[in-house]
Amino acid sequence: MLKEYRTVTEVVGPLMVVEGVEGVKYDELVEIELHTGEKRRGKVLEVNGSKAMVQIFEGSSGINLKGTKAKFLGRPLELGVSEDMLGRVFDGMGRPNDNGPDIIPEKRVDINGEAINPMARDFPSEFIQTGVSAIDGLNTLVRGQKLPVFSAAGLPHAELAAQIARQAKVLNSDSKFAIVFAAIGITFEEAQFFQDEFKRTGAIDRSVLFMNLASDPAIERIATPRMALTCAEYLAYEKGMQVLVIMTDITNYAEALREISAARKEVPGRRGYPGYLYTDLSTLYERAGRLRGKEGSITQIPILTMPEDDKTHPIPDLTGYITEGQIILSRELYKKGIMPPIDVLPSLSRLKDKGIGKGKTREDHADTMNQLFAAYSQGKQAKELSAILGESALSDTDKKLAKFAEAFEDEYVSQGFNTNRTIEETLNLGWKLLKMLPRTELKRIRDEYLEKYMPREEE
């Protein structure tokens, strides 16, 4: 039997303390009724004896201690899931936000997900084509991987996210491909951009959007990514779809976590973030992957903005420990007008070797990737040397490497946000650029591939 309590004794920020409770569980959903009759939702954060601390999703403004009632519903926060969610836009709490009808759920699922037995996981191995050369060619995304994008304030990560959502697909697969997009604490303008972009290109038909705006209560940001991942798990493991989850901006999620931690008067960790930030982030990132015996998969691209462009900040630092690589956006490349401004040298996909090669992309992929990395790195060093000592100090080979580095940035990395390159086009473009270098410098490519794929001189 559900009990209703009128014993609210304290309200601090987004938190509320209810006394005299019995049989209340951690993470239990709470219905809060204000003295005005307005209803809000919350969840139990902590139970200590007969006291329960409740996190209020819609914020605590207007709550009167005497007139407020709390009803503990005996179940966690749930999302009603259905295949009809495709093509729809929801708010950060999973309510329809596009003037469409309510979803008739096939079932209701706890948004915290279930623990996955590590032995049930299957290893990521299939290539996902994003249409972005700097990712496909050099930092390949693999089905079931979690590959974050480290951006910074003012960089075009929103445009890159929209481009990937629009273009991504699994090659050589008959399975349906779906996008689940979670916007966490973004501005109204960004939300409008994403919705317009998805609708303009038709990507909305295979997508589910969860939009938590900057003007929404910060506490909702804790629920939004979990709503998105719950929807993704349903589509992947019960409907057999290949699901790509894009979450932006994880920094806003961590800020909301810090706000709750401060309200609970917890001992702060690095830079004021709670000591359990790593554990909490892992509850999001580890929901990516593949399961044995299941056709579907969940691939994650979380996007975060590094405060003060600092890679050692706790959010990117801890994210890097949990995920399988990172795509780093560069302010220097952005200032040069290179779009997307992906800095390929510090970027990394730890699973790229598992998703490339014969039968997946092309047999020469690994060799050309290694050679492009090496030549670009040498070319950048040659350009730095030229800036200090002058171009006359460079050898002929160094001059060619410096020119290669410029061409690589201008033609390979820079492609704009509307160009969708196939993996064949990306690999062929790499060969075209490598032709600028003397054959003696192409030490990382096998001779048979040089003979087979190197463009011939025009007759």
Curated annotation (Swiss-Prot):
One of its GO terms (molecular function) is ATP binding. InterPro entries: ATP-synt_VA_C, ATPase_a/bsu_AS, ATPase_F1/V1/A1_a/bsu_N, ATPase_F1/V1/A1_a/bsu_N_sf, ATPase_F1/V1/A1_a/bsu_nucl-bd, P-loop_NTPase, V-ATPase_su_B/beta. Keywords: ATP synthesis, Hydrogen ion transport, Ion transport, Transport. It holds the Pfam family ATP-synt_ab_N. GO terms for biological process: proton motive force-driven plasma membrane ATP synthesis. GO terms for cellular component: proton-transporting ATP synthase complex. Produces ATP from ADP in the presence of a proton gradient across the membrane. The V-type beta chain is a regulatory subunit. Belongs to the ATPase alpha/beta chains family. This is V-type ATP synthase beta chain. It comes from Clostridium botulinum (strain Eklund 17B / Type B).
